[in-house]
A protein has these predicted regions:
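Active-site beta-strand->loop->alpha-helix modules in alpha/beta enzyme cores, enriched
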Residues: 1-158
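The feature marks non-catalytic terminal segments
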Residues: 1-19, 85-103, 108-115, 127-129, ...
Length: 253
């Protein structure tokens, strides 16, 4: 702890080792370092050769001051915060036998120049093996989630036209904060854009719930701030997760 009372977290431990994304059968697109596990941890626990691609995982410049969220999480600098969160993400995903890929876009809280939807879609489409099932966020409420959701929608349109598999998940904790209203609105919007979403029946075995809970516990720097901001819902849905399979609406004809 520094003399001014700010906790400085150490990330000196080496990162767990990670396989390459080339052999992944399932790839989950995550806006931030924790969103994939918050929303899809049970699915990740159930699937072999799963990977999480986190979009806003770039490390800010050393001169970047901490955001209010960083301060609430106990960090004295922005790059220290992101390096610690990367380490936590690697530990969490390793516990689920999942791999990870961190893109270098900065979190919106650092007041960065945002990519366009097409730029981000191109990056995602190029990073993910064509044979993998791609699962992305609806893109609910928060700026980074909305940008990631819009880019994923563009990628899904492309991949479905190529005969590839895509699905979408409800972003937690935002999905439950309004009892699913924003998710229902977003699903209607996807339908208007030519994508039909079919809810998956989700098994909810105790072992997968326990695996997700253990993975969430790895995000030590995030748990306190999440709970203070959003209440118990922030710690992730341990009931059935909300996932929809996507197909082109014109396939109904």
């Amino acid at each position: 702890m520094r003399s001014d009372g700010v906790l400085v977290r150490s990330t000196a431990a080496p990162l767990p080792r990670c396989a390459t994304i080339d052999g992944a059968h399932l790839v989950v697109v995550s806006p931030h370092l924790d969103d994939g596990v918050l929303s899809c941890g049970q699915l990740l626990a159930a699937r072999r050769s799963a990977f999480v691609v986190t979009v806003m995982a770039g490390v800010p410049a050393e001169c970047q001051p901490p955001s209010e969220w960083d301060r609430r999480s106990g960090f004295g600098s922005a790059p220290t915060a992101i390096r610690a969160r990367r380490y936590e993400d690697a530990v969490a995903l390793s516990s689920l036998d999942a791999g990870w890929l961190w893109l270098e876009y900065l979190d919106a809280q650092y007041d960065w120049g945002r990519p366009t939807v097409i730029e981000l879609a191109d990056a995602l489409d190029g990073a993910v093996p064509q044979e993998a099932e791609l699962l992305g966020p609806l893109g609910l409420r928060e700026d980074d989630h909305q940008l990631t959701g819009a880019a994923f929608e563009e990628v899904a349109q492309r991949r479905l036209r190529r005969g590839q598999r895509c699905a979408v998940y409800a972003d937690e904790p935002y999905h439950r904060l309004d009892r699913g209203a924003s998710a229902r609105a977003r699903l209607r919007e996807l339908r208007e854009h030519g994508l039909r979403a079919t809810r998956r029946r989700s098994a909810n075995p105790t072992g997968r719930r326990a695996a997700k809970a253990r993975a969430l516990a790895a995000y030590r720097s995030q748990i306190g701030a999440l709970a203070c901001s959003y209440g118990p819902a922030a710690l992730g849905r341990l009931g059935p997760e909300s996932i929809w399979t996507l197909q082109l609406a014109d396939d109904d004809a």
